[in-house]
């Protein structure tokens, strides 16, 4: 919706532009947080542990949400919408990019740290998700105006789903033994 109303003048277009861009910012950082929660749950298979760790994992998300909510009052922390209803990102957008990189790095850390702890992970496709998503974030950061991150998130989720499906074909979920 944000791209459809950007630069268009009609009743409520500016408000729609603010709200839709705010949802995009929150959605993007939410994807990083949810990925970390998924990795935690997938590795340890323990909801209680995941909820305990969520208190730490949610911090970058909260910072981003607070900044986006402040932005709705016209502060221009994350982005500005001009009088002509044209979107322009500002320096605060770096917080979102940094948050995503933190989430990506943390998910990779979780996998490698759990392997050192002796958790049995045959193959966990953390790079299958992080690789395309990171590429999308970098492209979107460098080339203003393109939205490659969401397309590459979809590709990454397909990679992860395919790997999970392939693993479930040859491994018993209950015992962890190979078929």
Regions found by a protein language model. Name each.
Residues 11, 40-54, 111-122:
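Membrane-interface helix-boundary motifs at transmembrane edges
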Residues 64-106, 140, 146:
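Extracellular-loop-to-transmembrane junctions of the mid-late helices
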Residues 165-179:
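Conserved nucleotide-binding and Mg2+-coordinating catalytic segments in signaling enzymes
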Residues 18-29, 88-101, 151-154:
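Alpha-helical transmembrane segments of polytopic membrane proteins
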Residues 34-38, 74, 97-118:
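Alpha-helical transmembrane segments in multipass membrane proteins, preferentially the mid-helix core
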Residues 1-40, 57-75, 126-141:
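Hydrophobic alpha-helical transmembrane segments of multi-pass membrane proteins
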Residues 15-20, 82-91, 108-120, 135-138:
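Short juxtamembrane and helix-loop transition motifs at transmembrane-helix boundaries
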Residues 109-168:
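Interfacial "cap-and-anchor" motif at the non-cytosolic start of specific transmembrane alpha-helices
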């Amino acid at each position: 919706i944000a791209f459809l109303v950007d630069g268009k003048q009609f009743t409520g277009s500016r408000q729609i532009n603010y709200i839709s861009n705010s949802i995009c910012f929150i959605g993007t950082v939410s994807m990083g947080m949810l990925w970390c929660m998924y990795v935690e749950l997938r590795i340890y298979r323990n909801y209680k542990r995941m909820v305990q760790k969520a208190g730490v994992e949610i911090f970058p998300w909260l910072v981003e949400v607070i900044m986006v909510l402040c932005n709705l009052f016209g502060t221009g922390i994350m982005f500005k919408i001009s009088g002509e209803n044209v979107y322009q990102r500002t320096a605060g957008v770096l917080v979102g990019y940094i948050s995503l990189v933190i989430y990506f790095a943390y998910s990779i850390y979780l996998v490698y740290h759990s392997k050192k702890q002796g958790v049995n992970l045959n193959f966990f496709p953390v790079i299958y998700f992080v690789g395309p998503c990171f590429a999308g974030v970098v492209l979107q950061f460098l080339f203003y105006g393109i939205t490659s991150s969401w397309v590459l998130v979809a590709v990454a989720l397909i990679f992860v789903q395919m790997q999970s499906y392939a693993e479930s074909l040859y491994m018993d979920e209950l015992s962890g033994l190979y078929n």
